[in-house]
Amino acid sequence: MTQVTVKQLADEVKTPVERLLQQMREAGLPHTAAEENVTDSEKQSLLTHLKSSHKAKVEEPRKITLQRKTTSTLRVAGSKSISVEVRKKKVFVQRSPEEIEAERKRELDERRAVENAARQKAEEEARVRAEEEARRQPAAPSAPAEAVAAPAPVAEPVREAAPVVAAAPAADTRKRDEQRRPDKPRADDNNRRGGDGERKNAPHRASVKEKAPAPRVAPRTTDEESDGFRRGGRGKAKLKKRNAHGFQSPTGPVVREVKIGETITVGDLAQQMSVKAAEIIKFMFKLGTPATINQVLDQETAQLVAEELGHKVTLVSDTALEDSLAESLKFEGEAVPRAPVVTVMGHVDHGKTSLLDYIRRAKVAAGEAGGITQHIGAYHVETERGMVTFLDTPGHAAFTAMRARGAKATDIVILVVAADDGVMPQTIEAVQHAVAAGVPLVVAVNKIDKPGADLDRIRSELSAHGVTSEDWGGDTPFVPVSAKMGTGVDELLEAVLLQAEVLELTATPSAPGRGVVVESRLDKGRGPVATVLVQDGTLRQGDMVLVGSNYGRVRAMLDENGKPIKEAGPAIPVEILGLDGTPDAGDEMSVVADEKKAREVALFRQGKFREVKLARAHAGKLENIFESMGQEEKKTLNIVLKSDVRGSLEALQGALNGLGNDEVQVRVVGGGVGGITESDANLALASNAVLFGFNVRADAGARKIVEQEGLDMRYYNVIYDIIEDVKKALTGMLGSDVRENILGVAEVRDVFRSPKFGAIAGCMVIEGTVHRNRPIRVLREDIVIFEGELESLRRFKDDASEVRAGMECGIGVKSYNDVKVGDKIEVFEKVQVARSL
């Protein structure tokens, strides 16, 4: 017998000696020291104690797992063999006799309960049927009296039908019992495992099967048949059939609440209405609008579709991010007076920039291309009466959007009208912009030093458009000025500052900066540059700004003279560098707390703008499909347009898209801010377009492609020139018209016969000149009866090339011999005339 010491045993089982001694004392062993010996029987006693303390079962394992593996070889074509290995695994669980007995008793009790319930139900049905027959008995007097005792034969069918009727309740009862005791193994499990439960439960199932064909007491219904009450059916199948799930069609239309944002795709709309997308597409086809599952619908179209299909529509605004941004921008602080923002507006060449030059003591107008302003210029001027910020807007008709933007960003509008020119179209437009923006007007009647200046005529013309002078009882100051001589400029500034005092303009310098983009451009060395007018708060270098759908950190700020500054307060125009793109003029600028918020809102705005643009473009295309059917395709002049600033690009696109007619049109296939690059040249090459550069030039790569491919590239610095050239190009695309000019008219006085030419008309030329080999018309009583060619023209037997008015001649008409006296022969020519827009 092998003996080891307590210490050796502790080392062997990897436990401390003290811990092992304590466990041995708990097991009832007499060991107290590490040097004492431990016998095998003592080890067994210790092991038994440890197992019992850990609640381990010492009996034999109740679960046995058998695994079997067979390998076979499968031969395939090409003398190849594949080895196939099949593995099988079976688990046998030994059940205790107590569990088997309890299961048998439980099933016996259940069966007795089911039989009792079935017997009671059968007796109740027999009693009801007997009462029915008893009530019907008096209505048939011919029936024998002993028929009243009809309930007697009921007893035998009750006994035989009971097990059959009980099949479904038995399944329900068993199911409830299994739910109450989920840890008990089911009889079906025993069938699969092949345990003792199969042998014990088999007789009970067989007894139900044997009685199944018994006649039914009550007539079968459709529900009973669907629940598995069929003759000879198996209990398990009945249970599965009874528990099968299914969908029932709704008894009426289901009205759903559909939430529609600014845009929604056809697929998303169908999902919200719980219908197939094909139904919506089919409905839109009925409305005359072809659609696809991924097509973006605008809010109005989606609302119409949903309401027509009978659903309730809730319009929602996808502005959660915008609302949270607006909440974060709220700031309370002390408001202080600020300088007014004044926009100078008026017709082209009426002296707006010259007036500003005199106020600023600068020479801006002299350096402008063509002598006209083509950008919005922003300046702030320190005067004796305080600081004023001026916005100089273009006066050309193409810059309508710029002037509208200037009116929105301003406090006061100076309307410049030339005294010698009067009220012009852009003057009226400027008045409309100011009235729409609710901005007070100050009228500056410029060029008052010129002869022929008539101030009363200006007052009269403007009063017709709702601008009445203070001298005539209105509320608009009229100040006569001369930008050249400086006359009346001080009075003009005084009138502007007086209006500013009435408006009580205030701002909060301690708040985060907020403003509007006046202009933006792409500088080759500095990247996107935006001219921003700060309207409230203070903009500082290093601030994270969100500008429309662009964002970035302000890396540098420059004033209007190009000098770097660190911060800009209210009503100060500055140029900022550091944005990730060129924002659109008119976009709002705001300082945000962190870059994450700015990026989220910028990406949201970009996606929203793209969806709305796609929806509108697609709607426009679909509307034009049916209009253009059967018509000739328009000739299109494709243009790739690059400009120096965003505002000029918008103005040019608007002006060019407005050109054209039913036969020709302009399509700007690409546009942007900055120089002409290689990608622009490739786009022009692919789309067969003309390259236009407005105040920009092409780089080396673009010039190389233009030379190799022979592209048409033109530079401009005046907007008039672009519009004129495009008009000429469109005129050339129109082709030419054929016009007829009547050369002469001859009256037939007599008809002769010639063997060579047939009928010869002796004529007197009464109008113009008759030429040989020209087309003619024969008119009888001023009605055209023949159109052909003059074959022979003679005068006194001599051939003549032409015969003038008042002279006689002989005319032979080719292929026509029905000339009569009194007819008129009209000689004409066809001339091609160039068309114009």
From Swiss-Prot:
Region (G3), start-end ranges: 392-395
Annotated spans, G4: 446-449
InterPro entries, alphabetized: DNA-bd_dom_put_sf, EF-G-like_DII, IF2_assoc_dom_bac, IF2_II, IF2_N, P-loop_NTPase, Small_GTP-bd, T_Tr_GTP-bd_dom
Region ranges (G2): 371-375
Record's compositionally biased regions (Basic residues): 231-244
Region called G5, residue ranges: 482-484
UniProtKB keywords: Cytoplasm, GTP-binding, Initiation factor, Nucleotide-binding, Protein biosynthesis
Biased composition (Basic and acidic residues): 96-136, 172-213, 221-230
GO cellular component: cytosol
G1, as annotated region: 346-353
Keyword Hydrolase recorded: no
Annotated positions binding GTP: 346-353, 392-396, 446-449
Positions with biased composition (Low complexity): 137-171
Compartment(s): Cytoplasm
GO molecular-function terms, A-Z: GTP binding; GTPase activity; translation initiation factor activity
Protein name: Translation initiation factor IF-2
